[in-house]
Amino acid sequence: MTKELSFKDSGWADYLYWQTKDKKTLKKINALLKDIDRNPFSGEGKPEPLKYNKQGYWSRRIDGTNRIVYKVTDTQIIIVGCKGHYDD
């Protein structure tokens, strides 16, 4: 079942940044978003559950320095960020 994809303001700002700065990274992000929809907790980008104050969130590697941080609910995949590292 496909879930609705939504973005927090910070996640959308990050996504728009990649649209203007780096098409290759944007293509990788789009591929990861499709994979997250199919398999939220396994697949490409080494999915990893976050801990401590970020429990309930997951991250996937875009590249060596950037991660997608997201949360999955019954009906949505919420993108919190897709630029930098989740500790930034």
Each model region followed by its residue ranges:
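Generic structural signal for secondary-structure transition and capping sites
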Residues: 38-41, 55
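Glycine-rich, flexible loop/turn motifs
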Residues: 1, 37, 46
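Enriched for short, Lys/Arg-rich terminal
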Residues: 2-4, 10-26, 31, 44, ...
